[in-house]
A protein has these predicted regions:
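N-terminal secretory signal peptides
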Residues: 1-10, 16-27
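General helical structural elements
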Residues: 15-16, 41
């Protein structure tokens, strides 16, 4: 009588190997069907970080008195200051005051003897400056545009160079930007006061030049071109400020 399949070791091995092979094929088919049913999901891109609105970037203040003099420079800003340099004295009313010695060439010295070319601050505002008008600026025209407009608005070549090296790349990187000069509106948000630290007497600059821009993406529709008023000639004690914000 021949042995049963269960009693045949060779046959038992063949059956076991065959079962494993069939099982592997079935598992592979199931995996392929699962892939066909579930399309691969692409990872979501990182959300782009837009520049903050109403956040002044690098307002800097230059001072050019007719003689070397000690000055208290107070700033009242309609918003929150986020950074200042050099560090001013904080006032109880929320404003700040710098104590400096200013020279006719613009050099500023604090009580420790450290020298500065300007007073710097940044903050977050509470209102939105509009862009109802302005200039549409292409990336390759940003430098020439700024040189021309800053000269009209009264910045010296050194001041303009510092402005352009900060704002030029920010305008150009947009490809096509809308640039609005909002100096008067910003001047109502950031108010300076200059006094003699010894007597407390107010010192009013003979010439105060302020340049503040708003940079945004150029819209598809036409924008009314802004008319700029040329700056007055510099006479006497001159103060100069420039800064801006991005949309």
């Amino acid at each position: 009588m021949p042995p049963s399949p269960v009693e045949n070791p060779a046959r038992r091995s063949l059956l076991l190997l065959g079962g494993l092979a069939v099982g592997g094929m079935l598992a592979g088919c199931a995996a392929i069907q699962q892939q066909n049913r579930e399309p691969t999901e692409e990872p979501s891109p990182e959300p782009s970080r837009k520049p903050e609105r109403d956040a002044p970037k690098k307002p800097v203040l230059y001072l050019y008195p007719t003689r070397t003099m000690d000055l208290s420079v107070s700033l009242d800003y309609e918003g929150t200051l986020t950074y200042t340099y050099p560090t001013p004295q904080a006032r109880a009313d929320g404003g700040v005051t710098w104590q400096v010695t200013a020279a006719p060439d613009g050099d500023l010295t604090d009580a420790s003897g450290r020298h500065y070319p300007s007073l710097f601050w940044e903050g977050k505002g509470t209102t939105i400056l509009t862009q109802d008008e302005g200039f549409v600026v292409e990336a390759d025209a940003a430098t020439a545009f700024l040189e021309d407009k800053l000269s009209t608005l009264g910045l010296s070549e050194r001041e303009a160079a510092e402005f352009i090296t900060f704002w030029g790349p920010r305008i150009a990187e947009r490809g096509r930007a809308l640039v609005t000069f909002a100096s008067e509106e910003f001047a109502r948000q950031a108010i300076y006061r200059f006094t003699d630290p010894s007597s407390g007497a107010e010192i009013v600059p003979d010439t105060f030049i302020r340049v503040y821009i708003v940079v945004g993406d150029a819209p598809q529709t036409a924008v009314r071109e802004q008319k700029l008023v040329p700056a007055p000639a510099r006479t006497g004690f001159t103060a100069v400020e420039w800064g801006g914000t991005e949309r």
